[in-house]
């Protein structure tokens, strides 16, 4: 293995470890020492490759967001029927919630700090989506409301349970396995709420 390959592999290991600590285990305050120990590398390598723990966190967050944005764009650009697009979007969002259970909690915490506001959707996509929603309402497939209310409903149904995961788990006295099962079951529930039969 070349030096460059070893360097690249070490960076990937550190990033994957950080992603696991931050977004799977919910340890947003994990230190460089904890990340290094978990990754099996020297702590100085984190500073060498990423300059700081906060920079590493931003990098892994941006990568997770980029992957999700790319998935959404593929769905939006497809020629699928509107309900099929929404179904794929819901499946992708729920899959991400299961893969990174604390990602939504992190996003909400960053929004509250004022440090996480990036335009997630281009104006052209937004206009097309609102137009498609209006068309579905006119066809009677969705209850009539302002199209943006449909988006609010969908996003709320998808994100809220994951964003308050620790609170739900504590108050409902359920473990990670049961919570993940409930999240996995949400696709049909959400579709039945959003669309008329």
Predicted regions and their residues:
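N-terminal intrinsically disordered/low-complexity leader segments
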Residues: 1-9
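Phosphate/oxyanion-binding loops and surfaces in catalytic or ligand/nucleic-acid-binding neighborhoods
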Residues: 67, 96, 100, 114, ...
